[in-house]
C-alpha cells in the first residue's frame, strides 16, 4: 500500500452561482473530488465553495448532493477535509462538522510535509472596511445563528 501524502487546496468554486450551466459546474467539481488519488491525505476547502450558503439550526440549502457524496466518499477513505468559511459561505453552523469535516473560521498555520503554510480564505486579510467588519460581527451573534 502506498503512503498517503498528497494535500489539495480548493477555493472560490461558487456553487449555485447563476452561470450558463450551474448543474455542470457542480458535476465537474464532484468529478474532481471523486478523482483525487488514493494517496490523498487532506483536502482544504478555502472558502466560497458555495456562492451563497445560509444554514439554519435544522435546515440546510437544498441540492449539491453530488458534491456532498463525493466529500463523504473522500472522508470514508480516510481523507481529512477542512472547511474554511469564506465571505459567501459564512453562515455555516454545524452541518459540515456533522458530516465529518473540520470547520475553521480563522486563518491558521499548518505544517504539511515539514513545511509551514498560512491558510485561510483571505477576505479578512489586509485593510477591512468598517461596514464589512460590522456585518461579519453581526452574523456571528448567537441571536442571528
What residues fall within each predicted segment?
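A residue-level structural signature of the nucleotidyltransferase/glycosyltransferase Rossmann-like core
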Residues: 109, 116-117, 136
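Core catalytic region of metal-dependent phosphoesterases/phosphodiesterases
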Residues: 2-6, 10, 15-112
Amino acid at each position: 500500500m502506498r503512503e498517503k501524502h498528497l494535500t489539495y487546496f480548493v477555493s472560490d468554486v461558487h456553487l449555485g452561482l447563476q452561470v450558463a450551466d450551474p448543474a455542470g459546474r457542480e458535476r465537474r467539481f464532484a468529478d474532481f473530488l471523486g478523482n483525487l488519488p488514493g494517496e490523498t491525505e487532506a483536502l482544504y476547502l478555502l472558502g466560497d465553495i458555495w456562492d451563497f450558503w445560509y444554514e439554519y439550526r435544522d435546515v440546510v440549502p437544498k441540492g449539491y448532493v453530488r458534491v456532498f457524496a463525493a466529500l463523504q466518499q473522500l472522508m470514508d477513505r480516510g481523507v481529512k477535509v477542512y472547511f474554511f468559511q469564506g465571505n459567501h459561505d459564512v453562515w455555516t453552523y454545524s452541518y459540515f462538522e456533522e458530516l465529518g469535516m473540520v470547520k475553521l473560521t480563522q486563518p491558521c498555520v499548518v505544517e504539511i510535509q515539514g513545511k509551514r503554510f498560512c491558510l485561510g480564505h483571505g477576505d479578512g486579510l489586509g485593510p477591512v472596511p468598517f461596514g464589512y467588519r460590522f456585518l461579519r460581527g453581526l452574523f456571528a451573534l448567537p441571536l442571528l445563528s
